[in-house]
Amino acid sequence: MSGSLAFHIIMSVTFMVFFFGGLCEARGVNVDLINDIGPNVQLGLHCKSKNKDLGSQSLVSDQHWGFRASLGFWTVTLFFCHFEWENQSKWFDIFVEDRDLTCGDHCVWSIRPSGPCRLTGREKCFPWNNKY
């Protein structure tokens, strides 16, 4: 293999890695959760995806917490959260790429006793997921 051909192959591979890698990381949605369970009710939550555990959080009434969901180039992004307050334990798929792309780059959720309500994009309230 000539030096010139090897150089062009290396440059092409480098370009593709940076170009496609940059596209994958650049695409994302900020997901913001608001504790609207009720006055003086603390909301515990734990969100994760297949590959990323965001850890446990605790929100006082009306407090916000958020994360950035990177959109996959080859896969569909899904984040789910487990919520606890008083004697309740619920879970919900908080970001589903196909469902939530109407949010644009910022998806805001109001977490309520009856279920999460998406406030951006097409506003809609959802029931909690089944237990299993």
Swiss-Prot record:
Domain of life: Eukaryota
Chief localization: secreted
Sorted UniProt keywords: Glycoprotein, Secreted, Self-incompatibility, Signal
Subcellular localization: Secreted
InterPro entries associated with the record: Self-incomp_S1
A GO biological-process term: rejection of self pollen
Residues with attached carbohydrate: N87
UniProt keyword Glycoprotein present: yes
Keyword Disulfide bond: no
Signal peptide, first to last residue: 1-26
Pfam families linked: Self-incomp_S1
Any one GO CC term of the record: extracellular region
Family: Belongs to the plant self-incompatibility (S1) protein family.
Protein name, UniProt field: S-protein homolog 19
Organism listed in the record: Arabidopsis thaliana (Mouse-ear cress)
